A protein has these predicted regions:
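N-terminal beta1-alpha1 ligand-phosphate binding loop
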Residues: 2-27
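Hydrophobic anchor at the start of a short beta-strand
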Residues: 4, 33, 119
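Short hydrophobic segments within beta-strands
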Residues: 7-9, 36, 91
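Amphipathic alpha-helical hairpins
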Residues: 14-18, 34, 45
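Generic secondary-structure signature for well-ordered alpha-helical cores
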Residues: 27, 31, 75-79, 113-118, ...
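Helix-loop-strand module that forms the ligand-binding subsite of alpha/beta enzymes
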Residues: 39-124
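Glycine-rich phosphate/pyrophosphate-binding loop and the adjoining helix
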Residues: 118-172
């Protein structure tokens, strides 16, 4: 079974409320969703995953420092990196409109792209991934589920059908 690792941190609990609906969507497609707070993530966890989702609060238009640090430390591994060819995505919760939530998602996706992950855009909703302003609404939580399911379908297409690039030391 393919596995997606959801790495998250939450400041006021709002990003944390989005984690389970994303995981539910992933599981609804028959893909394992492994959820870990950023402080518990190891390199082995990341290598074992076929996809990686970042869940971060909006911090002045950027991901939380713990997320940034984790991916900075992975960069030390050199090229090609251990995450190349995996599928990546992100979601965030901000404090209010104009707080930088869209920039936070772009920052997260930029980090994932720099590590060689494959990113899928969203043509009909928030283009870069789920966004909540303060506490996630029912509409946002529903989008988290549908986004997680859509994202899991991409992982299945690329990984389970052997279309994703082979990664030395990875699972595919």
């Amino acid at each position: 079974m393919s596995q997606i690792l959801i790495i998250y941190t939450t400041l006021r609990g709002n990003t944390g409320k989005m984690v389970e609906p994303v995981a539910e969507g992933i599981r609804s497609e028959g893909v394992e969703a492994r959820v870990l707070p950023v402080a518990q993530v190891t390199m082995a966890d990341m290598r074992a995953a076929d996809g990686i989702v970042i869940g971060s609060p909006t911090r002045f238009g950027a991901v939380d420092w713990q997320i940034k640090r984790l991916f900075d430390e992975i960069a030390i591994e050199g090229y090609p990196g251990p995450l190349e060819g995996k599928v990546g995505g992100a979601f965030t919760a901000g404090s209010r409109a104009g707080s930088g939530a869209e920039l936070t998602l772009l920052n997260a996706l930029h980090i994932l792209l720099n590590h060689g992950l494959i990113i899928q855009g969203e043509p009909f909703g928030p283009h870069y991934g789920p966004v909540a302003l303060r506490e996630p609404t029912d509409e946002v939580l529903h989008f988290c589920r549908t986004w997680g399911a859509r994202w899991a379908r991409l992982v299945k297409r690329l990984v389970l059908q052997g279309e994703a690039p082979a990664v030395e030391g990875g699972t595919h």
